[in-house]
Structure formats: C-alpha cells, structure tokens
Amino acid sequence: SDIASIAAICHAHNVPLLVDEAHGAHYLPFAARYGWQGGAVAAGADLVVQSAHKTLPSLTQTAFLQLNGGLADPDEVERQLDVFETSSPSYPLLVSLDGCTDWLAADGPAAFARWRDRLERFSAAVADLHNIKVMCFGQDALADHPDFFAHDSGKILLQIGAEGAAFLRAGGFEPEMVCGPNVLAMTSPCDNTHALDRLAEVLHHWDDSPSRIAPAPPAHLLPAPGNATCTIAEALLRPARQISMTMA
C-alpha cells in the first residue's frame, strides 16, 4: 500500500494513521542499506504495530507498537493500552521482546548483511531452474515487474502449486502460505546459514522431478461467487450444521 500518500491525507486532516505492519518488523532504519527500504514508519505512519515474531528473533504472539511523529499522544496511547491490554502480561513474552531489541542493537546490522548475502547466493543458485518461477530471484528480476508497487526480498514467492508445497514439506520446509500456484517462503535474518542453500537444492529436485505438475492457473482456483443469501453476521450467529463440500 502507498502508506506515504495515505499518511499525507490523514495528516492533512490532523488524523493520526495506525498501520498493522505484521510482516514488516524488519523494516528498521539500519536495514535500508541492505535492501529493505521503506516501511510504515519511514512512510510517516503515526502508530505502527509490527509482529516481531514473524521476521525477528522473538516468541510467537510478540509485537512492537511503534510511535512515530507528533500526532499520536504517548500518554493517551499508554492510557488506552491500560484499558485494552491484560493486567497480567506474559513475562516470558516481554523478556523475549527485550532480548530481540538487545540482539538488534548488538548484532542487527551484521545479521542483516549476512541475510542479504544468503538471499543473493540463493538467487544465483536458482538461476538455472527450467520449470519453476521464483519471483524476483534467479532469471526473474524485480525490473521485470514494473507494476509492482514495492517488493520485500525477504519473502520468496514460488510458483509451484500445492504439489510443490508438499514437496517442500517433505524436504523440511514449511511454507508460510499456499494459494493456487503461489507458495510463499518466509526468510529472516535468523535463518540457518545454509537454509537457503538447502531450499535451492529442494527446488532443483522438484524442477527435475517427473511427478512435477504444473500449477493450475488462478482463474481455475475458485468458482464464480453466487448471490449472497445472508450477511456475514447472520451466517456467524444463526444455528448451523456442517456438511460436505459436495452438498454445499
């Protein structure tokens, strides 16, 4: 999303902008020199929620709330947090966030430099794939997609379909998302040194596999939507029973 333009519109009306940047905790000031420019904070959002556990070394369910600029009153934010947050926080989760920030301060730039090196090595390793498209890696470049508004090179989009995703799982990799032909692989600055090398090897095996099936085009994923017979709220609150897809 064009957060900078959205922020400008909000600020023109003296309205603070809150952004849920779940997958963007790695968009830190020092990360720009390693290829991660931008992010909601740099774009001028006033409050940004970042899920630290997705791309940084922190336990699941941990997140940062970043305050940025002058429209968000820190005292009011703290008051609202007292209202909506639990009065019995998980101290292991809080310690995990403290450990994450300590790690970023001590080793963050070096870790991000190693992350960039691993991604570049991965890109070179998949350049000779013949049947698999790896978006913006290998033979496919970001310049080939002028319509892309932005690109996070830490996320690897593979067009290998559900069968390819199953092959990845058999090779020890759990995809973040599988949707039609697209399979999303998440990386982070905390990955094992050779994790992306192994991912490239698994992709080469799938590329050469006689059981490889070309993923279905997106148009074949879902049928055309029919007419709605009730609202989402009615569907949620009315009595219901489970039936098979063939009966739906």
Regions picked out by a protein language model, each given a short descriptive name:
Residues 1-136:
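Conserved PLP-enzyme active-site core in the AAT-like
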